[in-house]
């Protein structure tokens, strides 16, 4: 057989494993990345498009699975022995780190797709040796197959670990379907592990990031940049946990609850540890961090480099964490691996050894643990938990459930018999449908009533878009269901044009009130439905004005959430700083406008063509800032004029003097200004792939296709949060 690496037989595909393999992004690193719109598109899914995980999960023998997981907890393996004879601490850390990447700023990260299996997360320094945890689980995953996803299994195993050590959990919901390729997420600007170029000014952490250093889940347990300062650590903890949507009480409960179990690993110098899983050789088979320190496992294991066991009963739920935290004064010391940690003064050796029952050690803590005592706010909460163990247990159970379910969206997505009955405000509760829904005749009549009010296409379309486009496919939050656009904070967002919004909502509420009052039975229409229906009426009117008769699909069933069901502070995270679909920029930005457009399109689960057709349609319908990007002489008519005029070689573009981010399109012959546009508008003529999409919609023979595709993409956004329709 010929040598496959001979120059005459080089593979024509660039695999990225030799110096000759340079991607387009290597050549043009600042090029707009549109590929994130097509990741996890389904072509890489070995289960196929027809696979329905929710249906498979219903077939799962959950009791049998949990029984097997309970047995695994104490089935210590020689190749990776269990600390204290119990894998509970390891599996809690695995589940925590699967969920703990979640960040509220953009809803990305979290446990929802099982991304811990893939790079870069599988090789983050903070995830050291979690590859072993997942390998311990493989026989169980192999046994139960497609009825339990890796994403669900990682979290369920953490729950079972807690239960097996005497803790009563709040519940568990399945429903996390696996993906089959790594997500392209912005984890930070650094090019080295544990770099912290993400900070500016006085400890200002860049957004949307949620960790202090590249490759960490939250904070450095030794203290900021390894400086053992508990108060400085508290500042980092408060910031990073808040970015994960946790308040101070939840933060204290999570840290203390998690550190009630298990231990850290720092038996020797980290220099003994080999490369991470993704950088390993073929024969390593995806396992990394092989240690050459003595046996490299068990008592000789090296992970974080810290060597801390927090409690006297590391395989049983207790209140020892707080008892130890406040019982002793603490002195700075170093682990055998050289990491900063703290040791109790004048204490008895009461902490068991993980592998020798005859040995005892002095109590130890991390710098980040001592933050719970020396920060005045955390200290008050910690003392309350010390004195009220039942409150601590309840707070940890609830915070753990929130941690592991935060990115799953509304309860309608929860699966299984262990779903808790209680509604929690962070679940963005929407009332269940409690009345008959409108039928086709009602829908037609309501459309006529909406159009008869004199509300314009622009007003109807922009209001519906504002309501629906808050949806985030990352954590399944936002969307039109609930009609929260009428509540604080959304009703006051500048991007939603509050004065116009109040006018439109007032008119629609009048129609809703009159319709509901006129019914002889219990039939009703919610404002959430009527907002979307009004948008559909506006789109149909605009299409008709352009010579296209279309019917925009509409499915009733949305309900209206109340103020009591809405955490206004939490919803503030959904406020767009930029919305390229509406040509809006407001506030401090952390990406270019065109990058923000693609970012929002990805959150809306749109493809490149869907994003393109929506921008073109929304521009001519004047759904956003009216002064830029409206490349048409017949606004509020659904046409492909945006693309026709953008691609017109009779127009020459140049930056507008004194107007940052604004461009003027001038007639090449007369030099008269024809249009003004933004970076978001011009990117569809500048970026080669987006231009290819734009050219399709700018062709003379695709006017009908443009309208048809716009309606389809519009409907997709309007229904993005209709999990009841899936």
UniProtKB/Swiss-Prot annotation:
CDD domains: catalase_peroxidase_1 (cd00649), catalase_peroxidase_2 (cd08200). Keywords: Heme, Hydrogen peroxide, Iron, Metal-binding, Oxidoreductase, Peroxidase, Plasmid, Signal. There is a cross-link at residues 218-244 (Tryptophyl-tyrosyl-methioninium (Tyr-Met) (with W-96)). The active site is at 97 (proton acceptor). Residues 1-16 form the signal peptide. PROSITE patterns: PEROXIDASE_1, PEROXIDASE_2, PEROXIDASE_4. Its cofactor is heme b. Heme b binds at residue 259. There is a cross-link at residues 96-218 (Tryptophyl-tyrosyl-methioninium (Trp-Tyr) (with M-244)). Bifunctional enzyme with both catalase and broad-spectrum peroxidase activity. Belongs to the peroxidase family. Peroxidase/catalase subfamily. Homodimer or homotetramer. This is Catalase-peroxidase. It comes from Rhizobium johnstonii (strain DSM 114642 / LMG 32736 / 3841).
